[in-house]
Amino acid sequence: MRLVLPALALLTSSVTGPVIAGTRQEGTVLMSSDPASLKIEEDWGFSDAIVAGDTIYLSGVVAGVREGETDLRLAYTRAFERIGEILKKAGSSWDDVVEITSFHTDLTTQMPAIVAVKKSYVKPPFPAWTAIQISRLIPTNGITEIKIVAKLRK
C-alpha cells in the first residue's frame, strides 16, 4: 500500500502540473499594444485576454465618461469597440461571445445607454448577460466595467 500512494501522488502531480502551468504561455496571453495600457497591465499584473483551449477570457473593459460628456452611449461605444479589437486579436468576434458580465455604478441610469449600444454589436442568438450594481470603479471616471467570455472561431 505504501508504494501505491506515492506512485499515485507522483502520477497525479505529473498529469495536472503541466496542464495548469501551461495555460498562460506566450501566444495564449494577449497584452495591449498601446504603450500606456501595456504599462498598466504590466504594473498591475493582468492581460487584455487569455486564450485557454477554445475559450477566450477578456479582462474587464471600463467604459469611462470623458470630461464634458453627457451622452453615456459615447463611453459604451468606446468600450465595445475596444472589446471588439481584443476579440479580433484573439481570433474571434462579437458573434462568438457566450457571456457578458457588466458591473455598473448606477444600473438604473446606465441600462438604457448600454442596451442601445449593445444592440449594435450583439446580434441574436444572444449570449448570457448578468448586470451587477457596484459602488465604484477604477478609474474614477468609470461608469461600467464589461467582462466577456467568447469562443474561438472554428
Language-model-derived ranges and their functions:
Residues 3-11, 17-98, 104-154:
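N-terminal presequence-like segments and the immediate start of the first folded domain
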